[in-house]
């Protein structure tokens, strides 16, 4: 029976438990001259979004992005689909948003941007956007007020006697 040490002619220089990453060749990215549009909704807000190849400027209801969403958290939320696809600064966004508050509007804009990016290049973008949850509509909305209650669930004080 052969010894293990006999089978090695030269000792290896370094040992590694990792296997080399052999990623499947990706389909070439679509040329960034294709525009797309979509609608996103969140809570009571609706965003109609248009993506046009450009410098990365975002215009919401005719106002600059930073003016419309001064909260950095909302700005980050809206830019997330571009970040995960490495397309930050590749498209100009023109959006019309109606209804809801700042948080709902930011969520609606994010969904609209993600759907538009999906429409532009479904082969390359869909899997990444879906994995990060950007193509899912958040169905949570305000619960309706019920008769006999003060709010959706808040009841008037109850007295046993």
Swiss-Prot record:
Protein species of origin: Clavibacter sepedonicus (Clavibacter michiganensis subsp. sepedonicus)
Positions of region (Disordered): 1-28, 142-161
GO biological process: translation
A GO cellular component entry from the record: cytoplasm
One matching Pfam family: Ribosomal_S9
Matches recorded under InterPro entries: Ribosomal_Su5_D2-typ_SF, Ribosomal_uS9, Ribosomal_uS9_bac/plastid, Ribosomal_uS9_CS, Ribsml_uS5_D2-typ_fold_subgr
Domain of life: Bacteria
GO MF entries: RNA binding; structural constituent of ribosome
Lineage: Bacteria, Bacillati, Actinomycetota, Actinomycetes, Micrococcales
Sequence similarity: Belongs to the universal ribosomal protein uS9 family.
SUPFAM superfamilies, per database record: Ribosomal protein S5 domain 2-like
PROSITE patterns from the UniProt entry: RIBOSOMAL_S9
Protein's name according to its UniProt entry: Small ribosomal subunit protein uS9
Keywords, comma-separated and alphabetical: Ribonucleoprotein, Ribosomal protein
């Amino acid at each position: 029976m052969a010894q293990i040490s006999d089978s090695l002619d030269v000792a290896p220089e370094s040992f590694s438990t990792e296997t080399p990453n052999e990623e499947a060749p990706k389909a070439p990215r679509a040329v960034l001259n294709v525009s797309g549009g979509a609608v996103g909704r969140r809570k009571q807000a609706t965003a109609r979004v248009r993506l046009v190849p450009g410098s990365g400027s975002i215009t919401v209801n005719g106002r600059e992005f930073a003016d419309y969403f001064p909260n950095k958290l909302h700005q980050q939320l809206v830019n997330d689909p571009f970040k995960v696809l490495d397309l930050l600064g590749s498209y100009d966004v023109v959006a019309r948003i109606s209804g809801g508050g700042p948080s709902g509007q930011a969520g609606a804009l994010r969904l609209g941007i993600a759907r538009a990016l999906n429409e532009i290049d479904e082969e390359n973008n869909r899997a990444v956007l879906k994995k990060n949850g950007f193509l899912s509509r958040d169905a949570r909305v305000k619960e309706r007020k019920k008769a006999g209650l003060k709010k959706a669930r808040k009841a008037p004080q109850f007295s046993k006697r």
